[in-house]
Amino acid sequence: MALIYTNTLLAFTISLLGLLLYRSHLMSSLLCLEGMMLSMFVMVAVMILNTHLTTSSMMPIVLLVFAACEAALGLSLLVMVSNTYGIDHVQNLNLLQC
């Protein structure tokens, strides 16, 4: 079981590092965020299975719902920025302020 924890922690760390280093395009940032959410889902699901907690068995489903909402909002922002400005650079996101 320690190998599963190590792999998911490594996947989360690599996704976080990718989010910090490759933040020029919005699409790469969204992919790194999805990798982080997927590794968090696996970690929470394995932890609940190992500890046999029945009260928090819905936690992975709630995490997936938040990940789906985050992906939908991110993709809609990506479509709006690319339709308006023609590029998906993260530096242009401050132009969306009113």
Curated annotation (Swiss-Prot):
Core subunit of respiratory chain NADH dehydrogenase (Complex I) which is composed of 45 different subunits. It catalyses: a ubiquinone + NADH + 5 H(+)(in) = a ubiquinol + NAD(+) + 4 H(+)(out). GO terms for molecular function: NADH dehydrogenase (ubiquinone) activity. Core subunit of the mitochondrial membrane respiratory chain NADH dehydrogenase (Complex I) which catalyzes electron transfer from NADH through the respiratory chain, using ubiquinone as an electron acceptor. Part of the enzyme membrane arm which is embedded in the lipid bilayer and involved in proton translocation. The keyword Mitochondrion applies. It is a multi-pass membrane protein. Its EC number is 7.1.1.2. This is NADH-ubiquinone oxidoreductase chain 4L. One of its GO terms (cellular component) is respiratory chain complex I. GO terms for biological process: ATP synthesis coupled electron transport. InterPro entries: NADH_UbQ_OxRdtase_chain4L/K (IPR001133), NUOK/Mnh_C1-like (IPR039428). Its main location: mitochondrion. Pfam families: Oxidored_q2 (PF00420). It is found in: Mitochondrion inner membrane. Belongs to the complex I subunit 4L family.
